[in-house]
Curated annotation (Swiss-Prot):
Organism of provenance: Actinomyces sp
Record-listed NAD(+) binding positions: 50, 81-84, 114-118, 138-139, 151, 160, 178-181
Classification of source organism: Bacteria, Bacillati, Actinomycetota, Actinomycetes, Actinomycetales
UniProt keywords, alphabetically: Antibiotic biosynthesis, Cobalt, Lyase, Metal-binding, NAD, Nucleotide-binding
Entry's family note: Belongs to the sugar phosphate cyclases superfamily. EEVS family.
Protein name per Swiss-Prot or TrEMBL: 2-epi-5-epi-valiolone synthase
Gene name for this UniProt entry: cetA
Length: 381
C-alpha cells in the first residue's frame, strides 16, 4: 500500500504589455477588452484607482464606462507609502465582496502609480486565491517598472514591500498621456528607474538620456515635438523591453542575482528611514550613486564615467546624496539585503556604462568609505 506520493505541475504565465494612446477615449476599447474572456454588451468592472488620479481623470473614466454601458464600482485609494498596508488591501477586498465580481471573466482594473498597482495586485492575488486584474500605470515609474512586472506588495513595520506575492496581470496598458498631469518631481522619479536599466544593461539608452536629459524632462516623455516623440518612444522601448528581458526568464526570482536589483540594495532602508522626504526613485538614485563610487574605487568604473553618470543624475534633477547615508544605516541595509538574497550579497555593481557584475564581499568599512567619498562629491545637495 502506497504511503508516499509526489505531485508535480507547471503553469504557463502569459501577459500582454501594450503601449496604447488614449486609454480613456471612448473609441478605444482596450481598457474593457484587456483580460476579458467574455465580451458582453453589459460588462462589469471593479476599479481600484489612485485618489490623485481619480481627482484628475475620474470624470473621464465615468464617461468612458457609461459610453460602454459598463456597471462599475470605484475603490479610491490614497497613494502614499504610509498607506501601502494590509489595511488598504482589506479595503479592496471589502469592495470586491460588496460588488460581487465574477471570478474569471470580470477582471479587476487597477489605475494609478506603483503603490496602488502593488496594493490592487496583492488583493487580486489573494481574493478567491486569484482573480484576474489589469494594470494601468499612470506614473512614469509605473509605466517603466512597477506596471510591467508581476510583483505585488505592501510595507510592514519599517520594511518596504515585506509582504507580497508574485502575481501576473492579464495585461498592462501603458498610456504615456497620463504623464501630462504628473508633477516634475515624479517625472524625475521615474527617470531614475530608466537610468537604472541604462547603467547596468544598455549603454545606448544612457547615451540617449545623456544627450536629451532636458528634453525628456521638458516634454515629460509625451512627444510634444517630433524630435521629442522619437526620443521618448526609443527610451520607452529600451526601458520597458530591457526590464522585460530581465524579468521574463526569472519571474519568480528563483535566481537571486538580478540586474534589476541595481539601486535596490540600500535604497529600501534609506527610503523608509527618510519617509516622506525621499521618493522611491530618488532613494534608488542615491543607492546607484553610492555603488558607482564603490565601482570606481574597485577600478570597475573610470573617474570620467563616474562624472558622466553623476552629471546625468543631476541634469535629471535627482539627488546623489542624502545625510542619512551613514554607517549604521549601511550596515543594517547590507544585513537585510544579504538576508533577502539568501545569505549572499549578490550586489549588482556597474562595470563601465552599460555593464555589470555581482559582488559578494563588500564590507561595512568599504561602504562607509564610499559614503564619505560620496558626501564630498554630492554633499551640497
Amino acid at each position: 500500500m502506497a504511503n508516499q506520493w509526489q505531485a508535480q505541475a507547471e503553469q504557463t504565465i502569459t501577459y500582454e504589455v501594450q503601449m496604447t494612446d488614449g486609454v480613456l477615449d471612448p473609441s478605444n476599447r482596450a481598457l474593457l477588452d484587456a483580460g476579458a474572456t467574455v465580451r458582453t454588451d453589459q460588462p462589469r468592472r471593479f476599479i481600484v484607482i489612485d485618489a490623485n488620479v481619480h481627482e484628475i481623470y475620474g470624470d473621464a473614466l465615468r464617461k468612458y464606462l457609461a459610453h460602454h454601458n459598463c456597471e462599475y464600482r470605484l475603490c479610491v485609494l490614497s497613494a502614499s507609502e504610509e498607506a501601502k498596508t494590509m489595511e488598504s488591501v482589506f479595503t479592496v477586498v471589502d469592495g470586491l465582496d460588496s460588488f460581487g465580481i465574477s471570478r474569471r471573466h470580470e477582471p479587476i482594473i487597477a489605475i494609478g502609480g506603483g503603490i496602488v498597482l502593488d496594493i490592487a495586485g496583492l488583493a487580486a492575488s489573494m481574493y478567491r486565491r486569484s482573480t484576474p486584474y489589469v494594470r494601468v500605470p499612470t506614473s512614469l515609474i509605473g509605466l517603466v517598472d512597477a506596471g510591467v512586472g508581476i510583483k505585488t506588495g505592501v510595507n510592514f513595520g519599517s520594511h518596504k514591500n515585506r509582504l507580497g506575492t508574485y502575481f501576473a496581470p492579464t495585461a498592462a496598458l501603458l498610456d504615456r498621456g497620463f504623464l501630462d498631469t504628473v508633477d516634475d518631481r515624479h517625472i524625475s522619479n521615474g527617470l531614475a528607474e530608466i537610468l537604472k536599466i541604462a547603467l547596468v544593461k544598455d549603454a545606448e539608452l544612457f547615451r540617449l538620456m545623456e544627450e536629451h536629459a532636458e528634453l525628456l524632462l521638458a516634454e515629460r516623455l509625451t512627444g510634444r515635438t517630433p524630435t521629442g516623440d522619437v526620443v521618448a518612444r526609443e527610451v520607452f522601448s529600451r526601458a520597458v523591453g530591457g526590464m522585460l528581458e530581465e524579468l521574463e526568464p526569472n519571474l519568480w526570482e528563483q535566481e537571486l542575482e538580478r540586474l534589476v536589483d541595481y539601486g535596490h540594495s540600500f535604497s529600501p532602508t534609506l527610503e523608509m528611514r527618510a519617509l516622506p522626504a525621499l521618493l522611491h526613485g530618488e532613494a534608488v538614485t542615491v543607492d546607484m550613486a553610492l555603488t558607482t563610487v564603490l565601482a570606481e574605487a574597485r577600478g570597475l568604473v573610470s573617474t570620467s564615467d563616474r562624472e558622466r553618470i553623476f552629471q546625468v543624475m543631476r541634469r535629471l534633477r535627482l539627488p546623489v546624496w542624502h545625510p542619512l547615508l551613514e554607517a549604521g544605516l549601511l550596515e543594517h541595509a547590507l544585513r537585510e539585503t544579504t538576508r533577502h538574497r539568501d545569505g549572499l550579497q549578490r550586489m549588482p555593481i556597474p562595470v563601465g556604462i552599460g555593464g555589470a557584475r555581482f559582488l559578494h564581499d563588500l564590507t561595512v568599512a568599504e561602504l562607509t568609505g564610499a559614503a564619505e567619498s560620496l558626501r564630498e562629491l554630492g554633499g551640497g545637495e
